Each structure stands twice: as C-alpha cells, then as structure tokens.
From Swiss-Prot:
Structural subunit of the major fimbriae. These long, filamentous pili are attached to the cell surface; they mediate biofilm formation, adhesion onto host cells and onto other bacteria that are part of the oral microbiome. They play an important role in the invasion of periodontal tissues. Fimbriae and their constituents are major virulence factors. FimA proteins from different strains have highly divergent sequences, and this has been used for classification. The sequence-based classification correlates with pathogenicity. Residues 377-386 are annotated as: Important for oligomerization and fimbrium assembly. One of its GO terms (biological process) is cell adhesion. PROSITE patterns: PROKAR_LIPOPROTEIN (PS51257). Gene3D superfamilies: 2.60.40.2580, 2.60.40.3690. GO terms for molecular function: structural molecule activity. The record marks R46, A47 as: Cleavage. The gene is fimA. This is Major fimbrium subunit FimA type-2. InterPro entries: FimA_C, FimA_N, Fimbrillin.
C-alpha cells in the first residue's frame, strides 16, 4: 500500500490531493502514540445488486481530533480496520466514515466534519458503496500503541475491548417484496390491475451525516414520476429524477424492488411530507381487457383513474406511516419517519381500484393493505391492503 505524507508547513496546498489515497494526509507527523480502530458493520442482506454489497466497506477513513483540530487522518481500502494511525497521547475524539467517495476530509475541523451533509443521487442507488458513519467518540490515548474495539490479544492500551465501533449506513432502503392483486368480492368480477412502473415520491434530497437524527431542515424533495400531482403531500421544492423510477418487475424477498432514500421526518418544516413508494399501472376489466368508455368515465368520476379516456391508476404506500390499513412486524421504529440503516420491506395486497393522485391522503377504507418489515440493516415489514 502506497503511503504519502504531507508536511503542513509550506506544503498545505498539496494536502487536498490526498483524498483518494489509501492513507490520507496526516496533519501530525510526529507523535508518541498510535491508534488502531476495528469496526463492527451491520450484517449483509439482500441488495438491489449483488448480495452483500450493501454491507461492503470500500474505503474506511478514521480521523483523530485534539479539540477542534484534526491531528491525524488515515484511510484503508476494502477493510474494516485502520491500523497504526500516528497521533499523540491525551484526550482525543475519533470520527469514522466509510465510502466517502471524493469527499475532501483532510484538514477539516471537528465542527466542519459534524456539519457535513449528503445528497440523494443516482450514484447512491447502487448497493455497493453506501456511505456509512459512526458518531464521534471520546477516547484517552496513552503513549505507545492504542487499540479500539480489538480482542485484547495485541497488548497495548485497549479501548472498548471486544466492542468494535459500530458504523451505520446513512441511507435507508424502501422496497416492495410482494405485490399481490386479490380483488375483494365487490370488485372481483369488475376490475383487475396491470402494473407498469414503481416510483419513489417525496424522497428527501439532503441529509446530515452525523447526529441523533440525520433529517435536516432543507425542504427539497425528489420524485421519480414525470407527472405533477399537486396533492396535499406535494412539496413546493420538488425535482423529477428518472432514477427514482423503474419498470415493474415482480418483487420477492430475494429480489426486492425499490430505492435507497435518506432520513426524513414527515411533519418537518412546511407540512406533512411522507416518503411514498408507489406502483403505477392500468385499471382493466377483471379478465385483463381494456375498460369500456363508460367504465372509464365511471372510474374517473370515482377518482380511481387519471382521465375518462386514460385508465392509469396509482397505488401509493406511505412508508412507515400510521394507518389502519398498515400492519408492521420486525424491528420497532417510531412511525412518521424514514430512519437511517433501516430497510422497509413492503408486502402490498391490492383489493380494489387505486387513486388518480398518489400524493393526496388516502381514506382508511381504501383498497390497500401494507405489511412492512424493518430490519439490521434494522428490518421493518409493512403489510398494506389497498
């Protein structure tokens, strides 16, 4: 592994070029201590890509702070530990991040690092390389070798022995794991549904990287739908991105269909902003043939389809939302928010016609049942009846 050292005196400008090296610029090159850090990561689980990718640590970075000033920074590729970080003895703060990409961390103060944010992008829809953070931790380093989270066999000063530092994904995962059309007796001989697309709606655009809650005050949101709905949940600052939409593929536990999203608190700022996972398609006759013009007019007047000559309909699921149509199993998580490092797996049962506006509140008697599992990741299963 190539190692590069940058002497800050007279060469500070060169430090910024080190962000993609295995070993980042180390602000302190002379010291009487080293620290090695080993991590505990969440168990791998099924990814949108290859299994295990969601837990992959492609680049691990450890920063050591003396007060506000960065004393050392070091990275390792494809590793869950960083060893022999040169620093000095005394009270220090450790900050650990993974999969930071091109983020420039060398030389940042502790306050600057804690204030970092991230955005939801097309690049973070890949299972591999999900950004992860651990909350800053206070440690006391002694002269010589220090070890954080090791088993004690190394000797030296053992900190948090046998309890590695836990690092968590900044993103959450929302996905359908089952979609079943079982029309109720009232509709069984009248209607069916032909799915076409899956979208994420009202997805938070930005997130903090550190803090008890990562939901920030920025009121910008993203949608995968090209349609403007102007519903009660529609944000004012709303941007379409095609990568929050996908063609319909039958989901399963082994092949979940969904997206990675950021932490969000639904009642924050301008009003209720629930993150929505939505399936779009066509309302048809019970045998799958197109509706007649009279049937489309009736369905449009009922608010089920978008126009009297267009049978497009939507089945929105408000993820981790409180509703009599929703039941939950798995990890307990407070409703009304998207929480980092959780996967929200949704089992959807369609029992009747959908809606022409997925960004409006749905009545409790709507034809949707949701069962959501939250998992560790932390896992939530949401069962939905429509």
């Amino acid at each position: 592994m190539k190692k590069t050292k940058f002497f800050l005196l007279g060469l500070a400008a060169l430090a910024m070029t080190a962000c993609n090296k295995d070993n980042e610029a180390e602000p302190v090159t002379e010291g009487n201590a080293t620290i090695s850090v080993v991590l505990k990561t969440s168990n791998p689980n099924r990814a949108f890509g290859n299994a295990g990718d969601e837990a992959k640590v492609a680049k691990l970075t450890v920063m050591v702070y003396k007060g506000e000033q960065q004393e050392a920074i070091k990275s390792a590729e494809n590793a869950t530990k960083v060893e022999n970080i040169k620093c000095s003895a005394g009270q220090r703060t450790l900050v650990v991040m993974a999969n930071t990409g091109g983020m420039e961390l060398a030389g940042k103060t502790l306050a600057e690092v804690k204030a970092l944010t991230t955005e939801l992008t097309e690049g973070n829809q890949e299972a591999a390389g999900l950004i992860m953070t651990a909350e800053p931790v206070e440690v006391t380093l002694v002269a010589g070798n220090n070890y954080y989270g090791y088993d004690g066999s190394q000797g030296g000063n053992q900190i948090s022995q046998d309890t590695p530092l836990e690092i968590k994904r900044v993103r959450a995962r929302i996905a359908f794991t089952k979609i079943e059309v079982t029309m109720s007796q009232s509709y069984a001989n009248k209607y069916n549904f032909a799915p076409e697309n899956i979208y994420a709606l009202v997805a938070k655009k930005k997130s903090n990287l550190f803090g008890a809650s990562l939901a920030n005050n920025d009121d910008a949101y993203l949608t995968g739908s090209l349609t403007t709905f102007n519903g009660a949940y529609t944000p004012a600052n709303y941007t379409h991105v095609d990568w929050l939409g996908r063609d319909f593929t039958e989901p399963s536990n082994n092949a979940p269909q969904g997206f990675y999203v950021l932490e969000s608190t639904y009642a924050q700022n301008a009003g209720l902003r629930p993150t929505i996972l939505c399936i779009k398609g066509k309302l048809t006759k019970h045998d799958g043939t197109p509706l007649s013009s009279e049937e489309m007019t009736a369905a449009f007047n009922a608010g089920w389809i978008v126009a009297n000559n267009d049978p497009t309909t939507y089945y929105p699921v408000l993820v981790n939302f409180e509703s009599n149509n929703y039941t939950y199993t798995g990890e307990a998580v407070e409703k009304g928010k998207i929480v980092r490092n959780h996967k929200f797996d949704i089992n959807l049962t369609i029992t009747g016609p959908g809606t022409n506006n997925p960004e409006n509140p749905i009545t409790e008697s709507a034809n949707l049942n949701v069962n959501c599992v939250v998992a560790a990741w932390k896992g939530v299963v949401q069962n939905v009846i429509w």
